Design a protein with these regions (language model features):
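Transmembrane alpha-helical segments and their boundary/interface "anchor" motifs
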Residues: 71-78, 90-136, 141-155, 178-184, ...
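Membrane-interface helix-boundary motifs at transmembrane edges
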Residues: 189-198, 263-274, 295-297, 329-332
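Aromatic-anchored segments of alpha-helical transmembrane domains
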Residues: 46-53, 129, 158-159, 206-219, ...
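Interfacial loop-to-helix transition and helix-capping segments at the boundaries
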Residues: 34-35, 62-74, 163-176, 216-255, ...
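Membrane-interface helix/loop caps of multi-pass membrane proteins
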Residues: 33, 61-63, 86, 103, ...
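Alpha-helical transmembrane segments of multi-pass integral membrane proteins
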Residues: 71, 129, 245-249, 253, ...
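Hydrophobic alpha-helical segments with transmembrane-like composition
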Residues: 116, 135, 153-216, 243-246, ...
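Non-transmembrane, juxtamembrane loop and terminal tail segments
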Residues: 5-28, 411-439
């Protein structure tokens, strides 16, 4: 889904087969399938899952430093989300958007939400007894517990830095993503109008805004750190705003959208400027700074190094997959194995938190097992997450009944909120600039 899709149907990077697609009667260029983007999802989600619970699997400090940087990698998910959203809603080699996609902006929004909310609702409801028990064991009042339930089901938790990691902590991502989906019907058509020059300036501007936020956090705390497992930030709420806030997520999503549009405006003979492998390795190698004297905090690594390199990687692997002989890494991420694993990224992401709480949340594990599970159990936990993700994907995410119900709900919600994302009195066309140009 949105994990980018975050595996969702509406975000699938497949507007048609490259071999079978034919130009439409209106002469618009058909978009080829780029499965390699879907295959990249698993390479992001698996280290994030590792990072959340690796401290229960090893005492090796170097490994812990290296693998507990999930807050760096999550930027890649936002970039992919924006990349796919722009690719599926704007026109190839044209400075325009697909009017049909945004004809009903409310429907666009609710379809996006319904591509991930059913699984979130299912896991939240099945896990509610455990989540509520945890709240009560932590001496939270029933009022606080009720507020946590409301924030979880309404996907509003990312707006509240003190509550962002309630119940199923990784779902703050969905909370931030929902706000971005709310804004995209207004923003993407404007981005689609930009030339390559305008898109480049937009990328620079958005990156600068993102960097300012990270500089603000770093100035308030410090620029260097030993890793989240070794030291805690002195300003946890500021840290939550820095990594969770929906506005920050929107900036990174739009970076991905601008990158996709830049590639979509390439001419047919445009070649990749570099083997995508080097950009992929460089982006992940930025995590290695944690093992050096240049051990910048996660926020700085994410914005200064990982995001620019990973976004450039997405652009080049996109270009490369359109070539007659794509590079090995492009074929690998576009392979059946990686696209299948990419489809598991979203259910694994949603499930790994509750499963981890069962085995590693102290108050819960003590009640169930007498204590947290030993380190030798950690590989079995990872296997359980993958198996659970597979069955959830096969029997819930792919379920025709679930998809039909989601589509029906999206339609009903769109009808109920008609006009929410559009002006009931659109402005009449203003010809003043045309008259001025003529004069």
């Amino acid at each position: 889904m949105a994990m980018a899709g975050v595996t969702e149907k509406s975000d699938k990077v497949s507007a048609g087969s490259a071999q079978a697609s034919q130009p439409a009667q209106n002469s618009k260029v058909a978009k080829p399938r780029i499965d390699c983007i879907d295959g990249c999802r698993f390479a992001l989600v698996f280290p994030i899952i590792l990072g959340h619970f690796i401290r229960f699997g090893t005492d090796n400090k170097r490994l812990l430093k290296l693998l507990t940087q999930e807050n760096v990698l999550v930027g890649g998910f936002f970039s992919i989300s924006g990349y796919v959203a722009a690719y599926t809603t704007t026109n190839l080699r044209e400075r325009s958007h697909d009017a049909k996609k945004f004809k009903e902006p409310e429907l666009f929004f609710w379809q996006k939400v319904m591509s991930y909310y059913p699984l979130h609702f299912l896991v939240s409801t099945l896990g509610a007894p455990m989540f509520i028990a945890t709240d009560r064991l932590m001496k939270n009042s029933w009022g606080t517990t009720g507020m946590h339930a409301f924030l979880n089901y309404s996907l509003l938790q990312a707006w509240f830095p003190s509550e962002a990691e309630i119940w199923n902590p990784p779902t703050w991502f969905l909370s931030a993503l929902t706000f971005s989906n709310f804004t995209l019907p207004a923003i993407l058509p404007q981005i689609a109008k930009l030339s390559k020059d305008g898109l480049h300036k937009l990328l620079v501007g958005l990156s600068g805004i993102s960097l300012l936020q990270k500089l603000s956090y770093s100035q308030a705390w410090k620029f260097y750190c030993c890793g989240g497992f070794a030291e805690k930030t002195a300003h946890p709420y500021l840290w939550n705003v820095t990594r969770f806030h929906p506005f920050g997520a929107l900036v990174e999503i739009l970076i991905g959208s601008a990158a996709a549009r830049s590639v979509m405006l390439d001419d047919e003979k445009h070649q990749p400027s570099v083997n995508p492998l080097w950009l992929f390795l460089a982006s992940y190698a930025s995590l290695g700074l944690r093992l050096t004297t240049l051990n910048l905090n996660d926020a700085m690594i994410r914005t200064l190094l990982f995001m620019p390199l990973y976004t450039k990687f997405l652009m080049e692997i996109h270009r490369d997959c359109l070539m007659e002989k794509p590079h090995l890494i492009t074929r690998f991420f576009g392979s059946k194995l990686m696209t299948s694993l990419g489809a598991l990224a979203f259910p694994m992401f949603i499930l790994h938190g509750p499963l981890g709480q069962i085995f590693y949340k102290k108050k819960i594990a003590e009640k169930l097992w007498g204590g947290i599970m030993p380190k030798r159990f950690f590989p079995f936990y990872l296997l359980l997450v993958m198996v659970a993700g597979h069955f959830t994907n096969e029997f819930f995410v792919k379920s025709k009944k679930v998809q039909q119900l989601s589509a029906w709900l999206a339609r009903k919600l769109a009808d109920a909120t008609k006009g929410m994302l559009s002006d009931s009195e659109p402005m009449k066309r203003d010809n003043s600039m045309e008259k001025l140009a003529g004069a």
